[in-house]
């Protein structure tokens, strides 16, 4: 199956000959008003694939992130659990049940890691330390910064995130799309999880969207 893109728009998907004949068709990704949560994983009632919006607590999930969720659920139908999506700047935790995104929680951890010059490989002791005492995060970060312990910086940030997102991973099945140190962090806490390639999930999401649109 071939995917023809025009910027952020999927022009078509299918055999090359079909794409050449039908390039006028398009499905904007994230271009429409977002769907309020809870919402089906895939919804193209508006002709494209919008993102998600949550009122309380306020959150926004872009259309391309939603596409990755759709790709994961396409390969794991009837999956019930939490997806942790690690991007360049943000981490999203999404509760999935009955082919719906029920709720979400997002964090600036990865952006803070970049600003504070943290390592890609978190220190596991730092994760546990701040997970246990998240109120000491600022102090822990200053100590790690003074010691130039870049792994500890990342560990403390992820530990604080895990403390805040405890309801999303404690006692739940977790799928990690991307990494950013989250696989090691969850493994250290004994959380059952599986790891998945986000780009592969995105490609599968495009295929699922194309099928839903009848391409």
What are these regions (language model features)?
Residues 1-83, 94-215:
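Nucleotide/phosphate-binding catalytic cleft detector across ATP-hydrolyzing
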